[in-house]
Amino acid sequence: MTFGFQSAVDIATQAIDCIHTTAASHGRVFIVEVMGHKVGQLTLYAGIAGGADISLIPEIPYSIDSICKAIEARNKQKKGFTILAVAEGAIPKERAEMSKKELKKFMETYQYPTVSYEIAAQLTERLGTEVRVTVPGHTQRGGSPCPYDRVLSTRLGAAAAQAIVDDDYGYMIGIVNNECVRVPLEESAGKLKFIDPNSSIISEAKMIGISFGD
């Protein structure tokens, strides 16, 4: 994880935390939209930390039917409310199967501001329940960094400065086994860290009852 990630998780988690009170008192379905067009790391971590009931991430295409079933199951258990953490790039299974050309054409007539509002409309129609959308937006990119990020940034900066002193260029400074290391740029530049749907953290999230709408 890069510096800034933990701070963003803190802010997204706080947004979910704040929604819990309103959701519980009004007995509604709430959607908290979290940043992440291509990668769902922020949504995954904030969803777990904030106690979201459903997390939708780009790496796991969702089915609106599965989401409805998850909400109905909570209603039968008298939970009273449901909170969804939805990544900006969450995508339904039918669109995930489209070609880039087909998807581009579809998006030309897309009527919703974001996917969260589309999901809200579908849930309202199918379940007859009120659904509210909250978008923390760019607040996730600002504010004061958390202590972890401050320490991480300081360590990486010091290690980068030492690389310059050593006249050793063409590297990114990373952390491996809690030690700063120099990683060749060609091994890291331009690469996204996608979530493996079969990873242990996904399995653990499912074990505690989080649905991914799959």
Predicted regions and their residues:
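Divalent-metal (Mg2+/Mn2+/Ca2+)-assisted nucleotide/phosphate chemistry catalytic cores
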Residues: M1-F3
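Accessory alpha-helical/coil subdomains and C-terminal extensions
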Residues: F5-A23, E33-T129
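A charged, well-structured terminal subsegment
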Residues: D17-F30, A163-D168
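Catalytic-site beta-strand/loop segments enriched in glycine and acidic/polar residues
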Residues: T22-G36, V135-P136, G142
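Residue-level preference for the first positions of well-ordered beta-strands
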Residues: R28-I31, T82-L84, G170-M172
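C-terminal non-catalytic interaction/assembly regions of soluble proteins
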Residues: Q111-D214
